[in-house]
Amino acid sequence: MSVLSLVVLSLLMALPPASCQQGRGNLQPWMQGLIAVAVFLVLVAIAFAVNHFWCQEKPAPINMVMTIGNKADGILVGTDGKYSSMAASFRSSEHENAYENIPEEEGKVCSTPM
């Protein structure tokens, strides 16, 4: 069997190459540019598709908005029914539902909590 393989291999090596195996040369410059632009656009489309499916925002939790009467107030998740005592320290004396924006001096910069 090895002798037959050796004879077939030597015959294949002795034959001239087929015409389809010889190179035709370089492509024209405009064709190279067209191929480069097409490949670039395909890669950008793939990147947009991956970004769209990979980076989708997760749906918000159900208890994110609490409705009081006809007004919706945003609440933090996990703080449902809890009162923050920090809010009482900067309530406005003019209106019960308003807060004071107390300025704090830090050198030459005037900053406020909001």
From Swiss-Prot:
The gene is PDZK1IP1. It comes from the Eukaryota. It is a single-pass membrane protein. Coiled coil: none annotated. InterPro entries: PDZK1IP1/SMIM24 (IPR031627). One of its GO terms (cellular component) is apical plasma membrane. Residues 52-114 are cytoplasmic. Forms a heterodimer (via N-terminal transmembrane helix) with SLC5A2/SGLT2 (via TM13); this interaction enhances SLC5A2 transporter activity. Interacts with PDZK1. PANTHER family: MEMBRANE-ASSOCIATED PROTEIN MAP17 (PTHR15296), PDZK1-INTERACTING PROTEIN 1 (PTHR15296:SF0). It is found in: Apical cell membrane. The chain crosses the membrane at residues 29-51. This is PDZK1-interacting protein 1. Belongs to the PDZK1-interacting protein 1/SMIM24 family. Auxiliary protein of electrogenic Na(+)-coupled sugar symporter SLC5A2/SGLT2 and SLC5A1/SGLT1. Essential for the transporter activity of SLC5A2/SGLT2 but not SLC5A1/SGLT1. Residues 1-28 are extracellular. Keywords: Cell membrane, Membrane, Phosphoprotein, Transmembrane, Transmembrane helix. The modification Phosphoserine is found at residue 85.
